[in-house]
C-alpha cells in the first residue's frame, strides 16, 4: 500500500505539528496511514486515488500564489495612495479581501507579527518552492486542457522573481519585485 501525502503548513506547521496532509491512495491505505500522519499534523484529507494528494497540493498552491500576488499588489497600490499598511490590513482582514496570504503571511512588516516580512523575508515557504508548484500546476493544466491564465501569470512573476536572485526568500517577498525593487529592504 502506498500514499502520496504532500503537506500544507510550512516550516511553522511542521514545528508545531499543525500540518494538513493532502492524501492520495486507496481508502484502505489511507485508513492505515492516517494515524501516522496525524501524529505529525492536525488534519489528513483523503483526496482520492494515487496522485490525488499531489493534485490537491498544486491546485492549493496555485490559489496561494495568485492570492499572495493579489495581496502584494494591493499593498503596493495602498502605499502609492498614501494608505498605511495597518489601515489596509484592518480593512481587508475583516472584509471581502480576507485571505490566508493576508492574515497569516502578510507581505508587509507590522500587521502580522509572525509573518516572514517581519524577519526580512526569511522563508516559511520559499519563493523557489512556490515557483516549482506553479510550474507543476501549469504542466497539469496544459496536459488536461484546463485554462489557468492567472496561474500562468503567477508562474511568470515568480519565475522573474527567482531569476532576479530571490529563490530562497519567502514567497511573500515578491512584493519587493512588484514595487520595482530588486532586493528586500534593509
Predicted regions and their residues:
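Helical "substrate-binding/catalytic lid" subdomain
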Residues: 32, 52-153, 157-181
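Hydrophobic alpha-helical segments
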Residues: 182-186
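Rossmann-fold dinucleotide-binding core
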Residues: 1-61
Amino acid at each position: 500500500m502506498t500514499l502520496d501525502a504532500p503537506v500544507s503548513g510550512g516550516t511553522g506547521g511542521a514545528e508545531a505539528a499543525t500540518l494538513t496532509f493532502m492524501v492520495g491512495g486507496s481508502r484502505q491505505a489511507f485508513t492505515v496511514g492516517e494515524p501516522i500522519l496525524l501524529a505529525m499534523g492536525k488534519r489528513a484529507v483523503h483526496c482520492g486515488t494515487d496522485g490525488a494528494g499531489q493534485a490537491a497540493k498544486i491546485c492549493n498552491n496555485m490559489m496561494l500564489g495568485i492570492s499572495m500576488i493579489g495581496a502584494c499588489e494591493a499593498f503596493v497600490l495602498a502605499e502609492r495612495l498614501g494608505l498605511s499598511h495597518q489601515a489596509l490590513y484592518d480593512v481587508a482582514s475583516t472584509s471581502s479581501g480576507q485571505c490566508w496570504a493576508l492574515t497569516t503571511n502578510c507581505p508587509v512588516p507590522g500587521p502580522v507579527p509572525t509573518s516572514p516580512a517581519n524577519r526580512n523575508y526569511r522563508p516559511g515557504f520559499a519563493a523557489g518552492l512556490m515557483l516549482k508548484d506553479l510550474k507543476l500546476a501549469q504542466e497539469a493544466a496544459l496536459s488536461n486542457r484546463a485554462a489557468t491564465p492567472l496561474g500562468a501569470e503567477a508562474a511568470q512573476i515568480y519565475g522573474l522573481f527567482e531569476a532576479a536572485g530571490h529563490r530562497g526568500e519567502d514567497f511573500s517577498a515578491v512584493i519587493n519585485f512588484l514595487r520595482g525593487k530588486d532586493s528586500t529592504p534593509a
